Every structure is written in structure tokens, then in C-alpha cells.
Amino acid sequence: MGLTETLSKPGEMFGDMFQVATLDNVVQWGQSFSLWPYPFATACCGIEYMSTACADYDIARFGAERPSFSPRQADMILVLGTITYKMAPVLRQIYDQLAEPKFVISVGACASSGGMFHTYGVLQGVDRILPVDVYVPGCPPRPEAILDALVKLQKKVQSQGLEARRQEVMRKIEEINERNKPLVVA
């Protein structure tokens, strides 16, 4: 086995000196540990997110300690709580303002499926307007569940190439647009 075959295996350590990796792997690794969340909190799940950000659970050890309150400075949105139809366009506009690549975590039963509010004014799942990457069950979910979702998102970012991620998001957005197409009467 020659040097060329040996060096063509990304992810292998060669002594204590260096590790061989592709540029895509390095970018994915760095991106997975520097997710900047934008918390969109509307209900009790927002309180659980505050607990997650405190010292007892320490979201900082996962690289997401910098909550951004400007969507242009964030690349991940956490939808925490009930979303009404009146809020849906605002949430979509905030999602559009996020930095690329964009990630979405739907936290709690209300954000994921409308929760106990099965009424005409409540959106029955945020996945009707945004391409959701990870769902967190619970009403409200424990901080450990939110951290577990963050770890799952990190693994997804590390395993998925940038181009594959872009194609997946575009496919999800096309599905959302197709589902929400207005009825035109001719």
C-alpha cells in the first residue's frame, strides 16, 4: 500500500502529527459546532429553552451558546411554541433572513403539530411553512430533549455535504409551496 492510497482515506489519524480530511469535512465539522440559534419563542417551550441556555444544562458545550436576536446573524431557528396563521408570514420572513445554510428545530407539540390547539387560528405544524430538520416531542419538552435535538442536528450537519443540504432544503421548500398554493378560480 503506497502513500497515495494511505492519504486518500479522510478521517484517519497518522500518529500525533496530522489528520487527513477533505475541505468539505472540515467545513461540516466547524459548522456543526458553531450553530447560532435564533429562538422564536411564543409559549412555554421558550421557558424550557431558557433553562437549556442556563448553567445547569449548558448549551455552550455544544457550540450554540450565542443566541442571536437578529435573524441575519443566526443560521438556526428554534421554533418554540404555538404558531398562529397571523404569525406564519412573519416566521417565514425571519427564516428567509437567516444566514445560509439554514437549520430549523421544531420544539414541542405546539410547534410540531399545533398541540392541543386544534382551531382555525393555529397552524397545525410549522413544517407547513418551514423545512424542519429536527422535531422535539413534549409539552413542554425537557431541556435534555432540546440538547438531544441539537446533537442530532450536529450529526446531520456533519454527515451531509453542503450541496446535498442545499438540494434537500430546495426540495422541502418546493413541497411547502406546492401544498400552500392558493386556489385560483378562473
Swiss-Prot record:
<keyword id="KW-0408">Iron</keyword>
<dbReference type="GO" id="GO:0009060">
    <property type="term" value="P:aerobic respiration"/>
</dbReference>
<keyword id="KW-0997">Cell inner membrane</keyword>
<keyword id="KW-0004">4Fe-4S</keyword>
<comment type="subunit">
    <text>NDH-1 is composed of 14 different subunits. Subunits NuoB, C, D, E, F, and G constitute the peripheral sector of the complex.</text>
</comment>
<keyword id="KW-1278">Translocase</keyword>
<dbReference type="GO" id="GO:0008137">
    <property type="term" value="F:NADH dehydrogenase (ubiquinone) activity"/>
</dbReference>
<feature type="binding site">
    <location>
        <position position="139"/>
    </location>
    <ligand>
        <name>[4Fe-4S] cluster</name>
    </ligand>
</feature>
<keyword id="KW-0520">NAD</keyword>
<dbReference type="GO" id="GO:0048038">
    <property type="term" value="F:quinone binding"/>
</dbReference>
<feature type="binding site">
    <location>
        <position position="110"/>
    </location>
    <ligand>
        <name>[4Fe-4S] cluster</name>
    </ligand>
</feature>
<keyword id="KW-1003">Cell membrane</keyword>
<protein>
    <recommendedName>
        <fullName>NADH-quinone oxidoreductase subunit B</fullName>
        <ecNumber>7.1.1.-</ecNumber>
    </recommendedName>
</protein>
<keyword id="KW-0813">Transport</keyword>
<comment type="similarity">
    <text>Belongs to the complex I 20 kDa subunit family.</text>
</comment>
<dbReference type="GO" id="GO:0005886">
    <property type="term" value="C:plasma membrane"/>
</dbReference>
<keyword id="KW-0479">Metal-binding</keyword>
<dbReference type="GO" id="GO:0005506">
    <property type="term" value="F:iron ion binding"/>
</dbReference>
<keyword id="KW-0411">Iron-sulfur</keyword>
<feature type="binding site">
    <location>
        <position position="45"/>
    </location>
    <ligand>
        <name>[4Fe-4S] cluster</name>
    </ligand>
</feature>
<comment type="function">
    <text>NDH-1 shuttles electrons from NADH, via FMN and iron-sulfur (Fe-S) centers, to quinones in the respiratory chain. The immediate electron acceptor for the enzyme in this species is believed to be ubiquinone. Couples the redox reaction to proton translocation (for every two electrons transferred, four hydrogen ions are translocated across the cytoplasmic membrane), and thus conserves the redox energy in a proton gradient.</text>
</comment>
<dbReference type="GO" id="GO:0015990">
    <property type="term" value="P:electron transport coupled proton transport"/>
</dbReference>
<keyword id="KW-0830">Ubiquinone</keyword>
<keyword id="KW-0472">Membrane</keyword>
<dbReference type="InterPro" id="IPR006137">
    <property type="entry name" value="NADH_UbQ_OxRdtase-like_20kDa"/>
</dbReference>
<feature type="binding site">
    <location>
        <position position="44"/>
    </location>
    <ligand>
        <name>[4Fe-4S] cluster</name>
    </ligand>
</feature>
<dbReference type="InterPro" id="IPR006138">
    <property type="entry name" value="NADH_UQ_OxRdtase_20Kd_su"/>
</dbReference>
<dbReference type="GO" id="GO:0051539">
    <property type="term" value="F:4 iron, 4 sulfur cluster binding"/>
</dbReference>
<keyword id="KW-0874">Quinone</keyword>
<dbReference type="Pfam" id="PF01058">
    <property type="entry name" value="Oxidored_q6"/>
</dbReference>
<dbReference type="GO" id="GO:0045271">
    <property type="term" value="C:respiratory chain complex I"/>
</dbReference>
<dbReference type="GO" id="GO:0050136">
    <property type="term" value="F:NADH:ubiquinone reductase (non-electrogenic) activity"/>
</dbReference>
